[in-house]
Amino acid sequence: MSARPLCADLSRTGEEPLAATASRVDTWLLVEYRGLWGHEAAATSTLSPEVKAHLRALGAAPPRSRVLFVRRTERRSSPTIAVFLARSTEGATSVRRLELDGYDDLLAVDLETVGEPVGHPVLLVCTHGKHDRCCAKFGRPLYEALRNVVDEEWVWQSTHVGGDRFAGNVVSLPHGLYYGRVDPAAALTLVESVLESRVLLENYRGRSCYSMPVQAAERAVREATGALGIEGVRLISTRGDSARWLVVFAAAGVAWEVEVRCGEGELTHLTCDANELRRPRCYVAGTPRERAV
């Protein structure tokens, strides 16, 4: 019996849209962990029960938070553990870094007040192969390609960021920009867009500070106006229910209203290990309309 195709290959050949697929995250806690990453990386790690419970609590804390393990090849023998705290809220982005002597130190430090500001972007490449085969197959070559075109301090392997079938996946912090289906050959193009503080629409999944319906509207406004600067599009308002939304963005000195509706994609395997075919939820944006502010 032939092996099932990879979920990322199915998504790509089926031309599943990338737009409006970014996870909703405002606060990121990145913890360097050089041990094996199991399917549930933190749960299967060698961290103490107290540290595991602490990380679970941090991941559940408001605002919308996510805890990821990260690593870099050249830091395998480092005597300290790198920890990052990033904020991705619109208009208030930041990244801070601190070095700890051990994981138990996480229990004692106030992550809200410690750490040094990071003056460069942090690129997370999902290489979490135990979570999904596609993350390793497409993520690891992409990680190596990015390390070859930018300071290696900028690029980290990470555990699951969401959307395995869109691998290779990159999250650009502090802005929380999700990119998918990034090939190694496009590494330099992606880095150039990051350095120029603009969105690379070809691979853009969305911005983590927005819900998925708002992500769909943001992309529609960027496509209609050509406004690619990260801060060149600003959310004004959103209202709606579980099936229809009206979202207003400001861009190019104009307010734009976008109607977004919820739909379903084609039947597919959402992950490599999924046994059942499912229809992914999708968000379809109408044509942006100018409106009075």
Residue ranges and their predicted role:
Residues M1-V293:
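Histidine/cysteine-enriched polar flanking segments
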